[in-house]
A protein has these predicted regions:
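Extended Gly/Ser/Thr-rich low-complexity repeat segments
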Residues: 38-54, 99-116
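Acidic, gly/pro-rich intrinsically disordered regions characteristic
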Residues: 1-16, 21-24, 72-82, 94-108, ...
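A broadly used, surface-exposed interaction patch
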Residues: 47-84
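A glycine-biased structural micro-motif
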Residues: 12, 20-56
Length: 180
């Protein structure tokens, strides 16, 4: 899972256009990552970069700043799907340091970065009150983090528990002899 529909806390200053919305910069607001909006946004996450830390990316800043390129440790695949309440995707991480962090659980959780339009109307989602909803979500990147805001169930995970190489080897004549 790379994200999920849920209610999360955000400081006012983290909310786009907070001043125009009359929000206090240091007050905590609870925002709903709206499931309908997250489903609509699925395609915008396809083939986005996976970064070793959160840095807003644009075509201009990534082309002009070679240091930003060093933060790129992988990519989201082209299969992104909303399976309530989760946004799921295949991931490819190619950086050895990032892989080591994942394997040791140091940076196994994920945090999506996106642009969105906040609609500050209160409501309730699955028993959780919220102050506003995220709408018009557009994926920007995915970051490997120690603790993600979406929760400990939004993590890098291997969804295939079988080692097909070993299975194929066991089924071959040599494999049968070796594993007998």
């Amino acid at each position: 899972h790379i994200s999920k529909a849920t209610v999360n806390p955000y400081c006012g200053k983290e909310i786009p256009g907070y001043e125009a919305l009359g929000l206090q910069p240091d007050k905590v607001y609870r925002l709903l990552r709206d499931p309908v909006e997250l489903e609509r946004a699925a395609d915008t996450f396809k083939r986005n970069y996976i970064l070793s830390k959160h840095v807003p990316l644009t075509v201009t800043n990534i082309a002009d700043d070679p240091k930003l390129k060093l933060l790129i440790v992988g990519s989201i695949g082209s299969d992104v799907e909303f399976k309530p309440p989760y946004l799921d995707a295949d991931l490819c991480v190619w950086d050895a340091t990032a892989i080591a962090g994942i394997e040791t659980d140091k940076v196994r959780e994920l945090s999506c970065a996106y642009r969105y339009v906040p609609v500050m109307e209160p409501g309730e989602f699955e028993g959780q009150p919220y102050d506003g909803r995220m709408t018009e979500i557009q994926g920007n990147h995915l970051a490997l983090v120690e603790v993600g805001r979406a929760g400990s169930d939004v993590v890098v995970a291997d969804r295939n528990p079988f080692n097909f190489k070993e299975t194929a080897m066991k089924m071959s004549k040599l494999g049968k002899a070796l594993f007998a």
